[in-house]
Amino acid sequence: MYLITKVPDDITKKLDEVINKKHTEKANHDLAGNIQQEFLIPDGKPIVWPLIDKCIQAHFEKFPLYYARISGMHKTEQFHLELHSLWVNYQKKYEFNPVHIHDGLFSFVIWHKIPFKMTDEKARFPHMKESEIRAGHFVFLMPNELGHI
């Protein structure tokens, strides 16, 4: 399951301040990306966690049976969620994230500054149907209980 939401402007502004700082703690060793500049940003955790927690709680309220089935979490029980790590990818042209696995029950991505518009990307492939264009897209591969995608 996935959820799409817009990051509020106040959080975006605070996150922008964190992202624009000079970072020194590389995150590449723990990440699958073919990206040269990946840095841990622990200062961003208290900024994004309230939004992420709110989204998770809303999702959990809407789909309690799903989460009970996949994790054993039940609405009547207390449970503690924690943001383990937060990092920023300064992704350049030709860099990419290959198919990879995220551990834990929840993962999220925030696209912060995208240097192009999707309409421009789609215009690069005039010979293709719009539904067939994959460049610039983000894909979740979510297997079922039997491992089928």
Language model: regions and residue ranges:
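Catalytic core of non-heme Fe(II) oxygenases with the double-stranded beta-helix
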Residues: 84-149
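Non-heme Fe(II)/2-oxoglutarate
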Residues: 1-80, 85-97, 134
